[in-house]
Amino acid sequence: MAYTRMTAAEAAALIKNGENIAMSGFTPAGVAKATTKELAKIAVAEHEAGREFKVGIFTGASTGQSTDGDLANAQAIKYRAPYTTNPDFRKHVNMGEIPYNDLHLSHMAQELRYGFYGDVDWAILEVCDIEEVGNDYHVYLTAAGGISPTAARLAKKVILELNSFHNANAKFIHDVYEPLDPPYRKAIPIENVGDRIGKPYVSIPKNKVVGVVE
């Protein structure tokens, strides 16, 4: 398949100081893990050189050490939402070092769509499979979706982490759907346990995907 493969370090090097990143996943499940770990290393090097380096991080829920923990320890977070539990992150918030909005998880995608946090410069999504369909990639999420469809649609550029630990058949577990926002929201049309209202993948224009970390 014709996409640009890159290392996590190469992907992280594309992200600039001050940019906003929206990520896949819900808790550590489904969160991209490699790129943010390298981004923390970049932040440490930039700070040691006397340069500012911080990014905004928006997710569906808590992440894990490689995102909330490593970036907090690297003094690399300019703003964070929503709810999160990582102990290193909590420590830095309670020291007054990180502007933090303990937003209810269910509001994160909607508030990004409203534009409350500015532009979404990057989406970083963990996926288990990628299909090329016309001018788009259909990407299949791993263990959790979170705000992935909103992140991918709003982002100017997208990095995919193709996690081979997950069986490609995991792509059948998701029903990807974005509701309308208030005041136009309608009832979510699920009435029976087998109902499906969305798609099993997130569709992303090829020209937005700058690289795939494998």
Question: Model segments located where?
Answer:
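Conserved alpha/beta enzyme-core scaffold
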Residues: 1-214
